[in-house]
Amino acid sequence: RLTIFMILFAVTGYFYAQTARVQVIHNSADAAAEFVDVYLNEDLLIPDFGFRTASPFIDAPAGVEIVLSVAPAGSTSVDDAIYFAEVTLTSGETYVVVADGIVSASGYNPAPSFGLQIYPMGREVANDPANTDLLIHHGATDAPTVDIVETALGAGTIVNDISYTEFAGYLELPPFDYTIEVRTADGSTTVASYQAPLATLSLEGVALVVVASGFLDPSQNSDGAAFGLYAALPVGGNLIMLPTSASTARVQAIHNSADA
């Protein structure tokens, strides 16, 4: 599927002297959008684009207005689209595009509308080949504004007050194995804790997009996919689930018994 996407983008881009680089990530947890068709203008670019998958970075026409449309899988033409966005990409720029939100009329609470979130200044590799660069995106429809706090190495708050649909700028991190907690913005509640094993996975020099995905309360959202953090590689494919980590506390033991 991704190969077809790359070929069609290459064919379409052939007619344009200016191009931009684009990666698309499917992060809409609505069951009605589990698989979608993506169009550029009237051309079908990627059929059956699955939830929690990403395209590779590809060349797209720049300097002219294009229409990106999303239709249910199995669509017959762009006329079946349930969403479209008119965009003009900047030549030479790199973009990350994330699909979030709900298309169903009922069964989801809350139910923000489906949309494409577009981040310019994307990266295909880390700025420093000795680091791993992480772009964080909040795409969980029922999750509040949160902080992301690193606890294993004492880095503390690495993302502050990120809300649904927002991106935090790239974090340029040494490739260590981290433990990160997703906390409510006031710090009172830890939503979940995850491992980010950058060293174990040998991710030095790599730029990743990490998305908050799924539902904190599936029972209010048609028993949909549970909340988690997922990473998209520059080469695309299935998103990588960050493993959960049991929350820990710092403890000091003091021996104060006078019994001989």
Predicted regions and their residues:
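Sec-dependent N-terminal signal peptides
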Residues: 2-11
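Intrinsically disordered, low-complexity polar regions and short flexible loop motifs
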Residues: 18-260
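Sec/Tat signal peptide C-region and signal peptidase I cleavage site
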Residues: 13-17
